[in-house]
């Protein structure tokens, strides 16, 4: 009975409090409007429930239910902007920002009210715009660095030639000439080597060239330098006869000699101190490489022993670390004719073939799966495309880029990329099947989404 009286008294108290709430809400609608009355009602209800929780214990389940209901009710309540002061009523009122919790659906709105955007929409760049941005950020080299690299390479060439003249006074060398992509405007970033040619001066009439396919190596990339006129000029008449192997000038013997000289004989610390840089011969590579470190840049100088202009075609042959039966042969260097042909094609129609080559080189260097594609492969692709009479203006650079990817994929499917100047040479012959598959997959993915390569 006492418990019933307690509940009844509580109910009466609730009825009195409820009447007071109703009275406040009824008058609040007139003063504050519907929205203000709703806020006042929720606040009053929260105070009432707080008093109820303090005066009577409640079940845990009921407490949890009321809690998430109140939370959802508060989330669903629109946040009203404060009313402007009376003095500002004549001023234009800014539109209210839409609430993120407002229910979705069609709603009538004033056509003069424009939504306020918090941040601008992201720009959608075209492939052409992305290529130009990639070229600016990843391909172009500052002119100051180019000038410094040329100066260092020229100084190293002079110092090295002076040393060779003192070390081998009996061997006639030509002028040590630095060159390569850096000097031809074909340098893609700082990864390309500076080519330092060390030409051999051979006596006219004592030497002739034999195609590599006519030797035991059967290699169309190479040539053999044969000693002739032995009956009139016996062996020993030429200072280069000391490098003969089986009647042929051996590139391997010359490479071994120069490797020992560059690694152990040249005083690189003294030369580096004189030039203001650090010079170290690379011992890890089979090529003759010099690593140059300057406070403003780093570059690699490739020392290339060359045999120039032995025949009427003025071929340039390099002593290259070849394997097997071709170890004593000389590799034909196609870089000079490739660079000259690209320059001639671009000059003919003010084209962008060389820019396309630089973009492809930078893209392949930036993707590990495409690292096997070197400058030689990409140059052949651009040359094949460049001979076509199509649009080579800057506006068509994106289209030519995709066309180059398609040509590479087609060549990989056939595992064949013929040399532009010697179709019997397949530039993909040294790639394994697994490498071809990896490169092809990366290129196919890049063709579907070219932006992923940039």
UniProtKB/Swiss-Prot annotation:
An example Gene Ontology CC term for this record: mitochondrial outer membrane
Parts of the chain on the Mitochondrial intermembrane side: 1-22
Membrane topology: Single-pass membrane protein
Pfam assignment, any one: Mab-21_C
Gene3D superfamilies on file: 1.10.1410.40, 3.30.460.90
Renumbered residue ranges of the record's region Disordered: 76-119
Transmembrane segments: 23-43
Keywords annotated in UniProt: Membrane, Mitochondrion, Mitochondrion outer membrane, Transmembrane, Transmembrane helix
UniProt KW DNA repair keyword: no
Low complexity composition bias: residue spans: 88-108
Location within or outside the cell: Mitochondrion outer membrane
Keyword Mitochondrion belongs to the record: yes
GO-annotated biological processes: mitochondrion organization; positive regulation of mitochondrial fission; positive regulation of protein targeting to membrane; regulation of mitochondrion organization
Cytoplasmic-side positions: 44-454
Broad class of where this protein is predominantly found: mitochondrion
Summary of the function given for this chain in its UniProt record: Mitochondrial outer membrane protein which regulates mitochondrial organization. It is required for mitochondrial fission and promotes the recruitment and association of the fission mediator dynamin-related protein 1 (DNM1L) to the mitochondrial surface independently of the mitochondrial fission FIS1 and MFF proteins. Regulates DNM1L GTPase activity.
Family (UniProt): Belongs to the MID49/MID51 family.
Note: Does not bind ADP or other nucleotides, in contrast to MIEF1.
PANTHER family assigned to the protein according to its UniProt record, in alphabetical order: MITOCHONDRIAL DYNAMICS PROTEIN MID49, MITOCHONDRIAL DYNAMICS PROTEINS 49/51 FAMILY MEMBER
Assembly mode: Interacts with DNM1L.
Protein name, as recorded: Mitochondrial dynamics protein MID49
Origin species: Pongo abelii
């Amino acid at each position: 009975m006492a418990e019933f009286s307690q509940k009844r008294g509580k109910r009466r108290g609730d009825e009195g409090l409820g009447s007071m709430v109703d009275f406040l809400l009824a008058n609040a609608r007139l003063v504050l409007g519907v929205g203000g009355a709703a806020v006042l009602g929720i606040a009053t209800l929260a105070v009432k429930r707080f008093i109820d929780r303090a005066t009577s214990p409640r079940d845990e389940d009921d407490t949890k239910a009321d809690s998430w209901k109140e939370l959802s009710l508060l989330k669903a309540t629109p946040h009203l902007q404060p009313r402007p002061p009376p003095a500002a009523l004549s001023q234009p009122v800014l539109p209210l920002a839409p609430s993120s919790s407002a229910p979705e659906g069609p709603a009538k709105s004033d056509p003069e009210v424009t939504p306020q955007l918090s941040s601008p929409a992201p720009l959608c760049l075209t492939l052409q715009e992305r290529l130009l941005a990639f070229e600016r950020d990843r391909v172009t080299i500052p002119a100051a660095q180019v000038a410094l690299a040329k100066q260092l390479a020229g100084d190293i060439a002079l110092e090295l030639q002076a040393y060779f003249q003192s070390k081998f006074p009996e061997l006639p060398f030509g002028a040590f000439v630095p060159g390569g992509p850096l000097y031809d405007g074909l340098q893609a970033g700082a990864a390309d080597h500076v080519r330092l040619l060390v030409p051999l001066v051979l006596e006219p009439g004592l030497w002739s060239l034999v195609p590599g396919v006519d030797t035991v190596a059967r290699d169309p990339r190479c040539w053999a330098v044969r000693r002739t006129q032995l009956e009139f000029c016996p062996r020993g008449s030429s200072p280069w006869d000391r490098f003969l192997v089986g009647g042929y000038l051996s590139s391997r013997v010359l490479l071994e000699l120069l490797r020992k000289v560059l690694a152990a004989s040249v005083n690189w610390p003294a030369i580096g101190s004189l030039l203001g840089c650090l010079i170290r011969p690379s011992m890890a590579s089979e090529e003759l490489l010099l690593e140059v470190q300057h406070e403003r840049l780093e570059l690699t100088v490739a020392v290339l022993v060359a045999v120039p202009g032995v025949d009427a075609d003025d071929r340039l042959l390099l002593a290259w670390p070849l394997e097997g039966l071709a170890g004593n042969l000389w590799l034909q260097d196609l870089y000079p004719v490739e660079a000259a042909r690209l320059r001639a094609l671009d000059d003919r129609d003010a084209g962008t073939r060389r820019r396309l080559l630089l973009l492809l080189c930078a893209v392949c260097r930036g993707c590990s799966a495409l690292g096997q594609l070197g400058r030689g492969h990409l140059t052949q692709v651009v040359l094949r495309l460049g001979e076509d009479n199509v649009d080579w203006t800057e506006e068509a650079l994106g289209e030519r880029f995709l066309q180059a990817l398609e040509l590479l994929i087609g060549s990989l499917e056939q595992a064949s990329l013929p040399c532009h100047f010697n179709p019997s040479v397949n530039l993909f012959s040294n790639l394994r099947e697994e490498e071809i598959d990896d490169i092809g997959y990366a290129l196919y993915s890049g063709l579907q989404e070219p932006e992923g390569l940039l």
